[in-house]
Every structure is written in structure tokens, then in C-alpha cells.
């Protein structure tokens, strides 16, 4: 009995140290990535390991980091129009969108609607595994609060655009722009930016180079939203500092 208790005690001891260590790494990551490029995300690691485990050794999760000044303002506007129109104003969470999603999901459990802001998506993509568990969601909330506290809105959006998945092995807007349009991210047009933003909900299902009717209709909706937000004037009025 004593040996069993001792075993549980040691397990609890090392478990606590492990949790504290992971939290410390996350905190260090938030501080470091406030200034330095993010070399890879948890999503990239997950995709790469998944490919290797299935024998696909040709797969390479690829991203080319670029600063915000080298990203088309249309791309910046497109992701906000598509994913999070209140991004310049909220503190990491869109309470209205969360309430709306909860109400929708209670009525229609077969088609779950999300309400994650760009800040939440950035925290999840950089630091967490994929999934819908309450544990992961709780960690996402804490990490989102951390990056909102330490990073500027401009930094959050810069990281998001550099790690977002746009296709099989294609991460970041620079890699996506060169792969799909043979141009740098700085030269993306409004239509091209809207098309890239249209596949963000599921870039492995929706294709930029072979858009379905749904993707095309979503692209047109995003273009309308970009116009309604005020176009480039919206970015000038919201400096994202």
C-alpha cells in the first residue's frame, strides 16, 4: 500500500512539474514571438507528423515569413471581413458571436458554428493541437488573453497571416500567393485576397486553384463585406497598434 501511495505521489509530483513546464514554455513563446518570426506552428507540426506516420515523406509543411508591410492591404482586409470584423475593437473574444453560435448550435447540432476570433485562431494555431475538447478550449482562452495582453493587434494579424493554412502543405500568405498566383503577397488583388480568405474555414476541403460554387459565392460575399467595411479606409481608420 505504501509503495502504491508513493507511486501516486511521484506521479502527481512529476505531473505538476510537467504542467508548469508547459505553461512556462507557452509564456516564453508569447514573449519571444511578440518580436521574432514564428518558425512553425502546432498545426504545421501536426500536419507534418501526420504525413510521416502515413508514409508521405514528400510532404513538407512550408511557410515563408513576411512582415506586415509586405502583405497586400487587401489580404489584411479580406481576413477581417471573412473571419472577424470586430477584430480592431474586441479584447480577444466576440461575446455577441459566441452567444449567437451557442444559440445556433443548440438548435442545429449537426452543423456546428464556431465563433473564434482571429486572436483565438492565432493562439490555437501557434500553441495548441486541433480538436474540440473543453480542455483545449480552456487553454485557448488563456493563451488568447496572453497574446492580447502582450502583442499588438498588428502583431496578432501578422502572425495569423504567416501561419494560416491555405492548402495542403501551404502555410502563410506569402507561400499561398506564390503557389496559387505566382506573385508575392504584397501584390495580391482584392479578388485574389478574397479567394484565399474564402478557403480558410477548411483549406484541405476547399481549393483555391479549383474553387467550388460555395467557395466562389463565399469569395463574392467577402468582397461585398470588404466594400461595406470601407475598403482601405477601414485599415486607415484602424491602425491595429
Curated annotation (Swiss-Prot):
Parts of the chain that traverse the membrane: 18-38
UniProt-annotated location(s): Cell inner membrane
Gene Ontology annotations of biological process type: cell wall organization; peptidoglycan biosynthetic process; regulation of cell shape
Family per similarity comment: Belongs to the glycosyltransferase 51 family.
Lineage start: Bacteria, Pseudomonadati, Pseudomonadota, Gammaproteobacteria, Enterobacterales
InterPro entries in the cross-refs: Glyco_trans_51 (IPR001264), Lysozyme-like_dom_sf (IPR023346), PBP_transglycosylase (IPR036950), Pep_trsgly (IPR011812)
Pathway: Cell wall biogenesis; peptidoglycan biosynthesis
Protein's recorded name: Biosynthetic peptidoglycan transglycosylase
EC number: 2.4.99.28
Function summary: Peptidoglycan polymerase that catalyzes glycan chain elongation from lipid-linked precursors.
